[in-house]
Amino acid sequence: MHLLGYGIDVNNKELQQFCAKSKRETELDIIRIFSTRNIKNLIQAIHNAGGLAVLAHPACCWALSHDRFVKKLISYGLDGLEVYYPYKRHRGIIKFTTARNIEKIADKYGLIKTGGTDLHDYNL
């Protein structure tokens, strides 16, 4: 869930402390949730449920340029990459990525290529 705070005093000590604490807790949660063991188990659970494991909008969250990372996920059973996603919306945080870059990576490793539910325009 995302909440926006309009008209706030950004120097408010209570708000600053809350944000700092939340940031630390979030970082720990991310490390715990996305540890290697959990990703491997999640992919296995998806397969056991009859599904395909696809990494959603990979360039928004991961250093996809690192072959080692992609190969590791494939070794865990990754089936595909969400290729068709409006990456242009995230130009500020994504330096090199377009759908075509992700498509090339999927082709290189024989992964299926998908689009997400938030893809509303194929003019990527």
Enumerate the predicted regions with their spans.
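Histidine/acidic-residue-rich catalytic or RNA/ligand-binding cores of hydrolases
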Residues: 1-5, 63-71, 90-102, 122-124
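Extended substrate/RNA-proximal surfaces in nucleic-acid metabolism proteins
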Residues: 1-76
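Active-site beta-loop-alpha junctions enriched in small/polar residues
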Residues: 8, 58-60, 86-88, 118-122
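Helix C-cap/helix->beta junction micro-motif
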Residues: 49, 108-109
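Hydrophobic faces of well-ordered beta-strands that scaffold small-molecule active sites
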Residues: 53-56, 81-83, 113-117
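Structural recognition of alpha->loop->beta junctions
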Residues: 69-89
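Short acidic/histidine-rich active-site segments
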Residues: 110-124
